[in-house]
UniProtKB/Swiss-Prot annotation:
It is found in: Secreted. It comes from Boana raniceps (Chaco tree frog). One of its GO terms (cellular component) is extracellular region. Residues 30-44 have a biased composition (Acidic residues). Keywords: Amphibian defense peptide, Antibiotic, Antimicrobial, Cleavage on pair of basic residues, Secreted, Signal. Residues 1-22 form the signal peptide. The lineage of its organism: Eukaryota, Metazoa, Chordata, Craniata, Vertebrata. Residues 23-49 form a propeptide. Its main location: secreted. GO terms for biological process: defense response to bacterium. This is Raniseptin-8.
Amino acid sequence: MAFLKKSLFLVLFLGIVSLSICEEEKREGEEEEKQEEENEELSEEELRERRALLDKLKSLGKVVGKVAIGVAQHYLNPQQ
């Protein structure tokens, strides 16, 4: 009878240990998935920010170009 008790306790102990290891791995996997999703979201936000910055620089370049042309025309044709 004592042998059966020891065997049963051993089986239960090993089952609990393996179950806790599986749950820990599952939690780690979920955390990694959350981190990957956050990284993807950050990447999308960074892309939006970069696009907005490039659009602003493009607009600024157009304005500077027009001003430069206006200044050049003013100095080349001072009669106007």
